[in-house]
Amino acid sequence: MHPKPTAAQNLPDRRDFLRRVVVGGMLAAAAGPAAGAGEARAPASPSADDRAYWLRMMRRVCEPVLSHLATGTLRAQMPVEAPAAAADRPRSDFSHLEAFGRTVAGAAPWLELEEPEGAEAADRARWRELVHRALNQATNPASPDCLNFSRGGQPLVDAAFLAYGLLLARKSLWDPLPAEVKARLLAALRSTRDVAPPNNNWLLFPAMIETFFAVAGTSWREDVVDRAVRAHEAWYQGDGTYGDGPEFHWDYYNSYVIHPFLETILRELRGRTDRWASLLPRVLRRAGRYAAVQERLVGPDGTFPPLGRSLAYRCGAFHHLAHQAFRDALPPAVTPGQARSGLAAVMRRTLEPEGTFDADGWLRVGLAGHQPSLAEPYISTGSLYLCALVFQPLGLPAAHRFWCDGSADWTQRRIWSGADLPPDQALKGD
């Protein structure tokens, strides 16, 4: 049970807030997506336009989720597209928390950025307020948008994505919350402890939540984290790749979840316990190798192999490469200009095709346009917002090398253009 709420503190009038949200969102999105969806683009000289494109796409993807939940209208306004053969219960029970948790995890690094001047600063302040209000709505039993954290297994996944986002933006999203909202949110996250995760990447979801508890200064279960860390160590297949459970699968779950979650958990708990200190250097070396592999998966035109499940996560397949860029931890073979250009090419191929968004700006199922047959039974509209994780490099300042270095062809584009490059090298011994 959540604690009984009282009136939220220090929250402006709802009608005035909604008016500011709508007007601000319209102005931010006015430029719309770049034209020429699906074209192969030649790298351009570095300019403010590179970052502006990423910001524009982040606003287009994330603004509807945050603005509607902040004002208690997410359930009323977000459609829930799901396969006819959806799993054991309606996806509408889960889809809204999916959308929120994944959106916050993608936007969090940018929201934590401390650059007090300029147009981005004003947008960041507005979005921080949106997330604060959304967290209040999501955990308030009196809200029409009180989200499901405790019924079924799926909420464990997206509570973990929300915890991940709060870890990446603790100063801007968690610390300023009123004590009442913090208490409700902690109770909601604790309610996921009743879910028994399957023996695969799901072990990282309760581990991420327990890590957040540790960082938030409340009681946490070290054994839950240890189980996830030890299991993935046992499932390591070599050359930077983990099994999703004991067996290997051709899919993008090393990027969707495994590498970014495992690295974040170990980074955040470093200094709180030395239990896994010896593992972190190995985990980081593997993460570097997998980032190099991901960069090589980007085709000359920004496409990538449509392998495995959850392809409707679109450019979220490159969460790990984006996360390594945000961490300033790209491998030596991948320059910031390569990573920025390659990720932007993937974004264009997966977010710009006709049919990607509905008339009201909500994502639709597909990889390149509207392709509902690609959806597994667990996919619904909220699931699709995992694509937002590609925006994590926006957490780097505008003056960082990632944004200022010259644009560069990524590996496949160079090789298929005839460039003479050294061979790829496997990671051995880790």
Segments predicted by a language model, with ranges:
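Low-complexity, Ser/Thr/Pro/Gly-enriched N-terminal "stalk/linker" regions
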Residues: 23-27, 39-98, 105, 109, ...
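Aromatic-lined, polymer-binding surfaces characteristic
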Residues: 107-109, 124-284, 296-319
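CBM-like carbohydrate-recognition segments
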Residues: 67-80, 84, 88, 139, ...
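N-terminal secretory signal peptides
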Residues: 1-16, 23, 29, 39
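An acidic intrinsically disordered interaction segment
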Residues: 49-76, 119-133, 171-179, 214-233, ...
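Long, repeat-rich segments with strong aromatic
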Residues: 248-363, 375-398
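C-terminal segment of classical bacterial N-terminal signal peptides
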Residues: 31-34
